[in-house]
Amino acid sequence: MLFRSNVSKKFAPIAGKKKCIVIDNSSFFRMDKDVPLIVPEVNPHHVSDFKKKNIIANPNCSTIQMVTALSPLHKEFTIKKVFVSTYQAVSGAGKAAMDELFNQTKGVYVNDSSIPEQFTKKISFNVIPHIDVFMDDGSTKEEWKMS
């Protein structure tokens, strides 16, 4: 299923109860202890853990790339700590964010500055060192998902 979390939340359990095996790409089931989080190149042996709910989840895109690259190194050398920088596309924040990027970019050429609404700062021609919401421990949700 490639839907927003609310769609997966509603329909994946229905399909699972009807004995369909659901492979969900949304974020909804990623932290569910009864749903295996699978990266086939890293932990294919956990695929059979889907049987409680008939749902398999996958991590977010940054995590998949990171664990795929680090898995063979970890097996050989036992990695203890990793420092990661990710750069996320504006498109991941949705249509309103894309519209804001377009309008800000256009505004640079016609001397029309707009006030950011989707981001904390102007996004056109910029890199913002922040993604998602802040958690109680001061990290962002994106950092939490990768830890």
Feature-to-residue mapping (PLM):
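N-terminal Rossmann-like NAD(P) cofactor-binding subdomain of oxidoreductases
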Residues: 1-123
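Oxyanion-binding "anion nests"
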Residues: 118-147
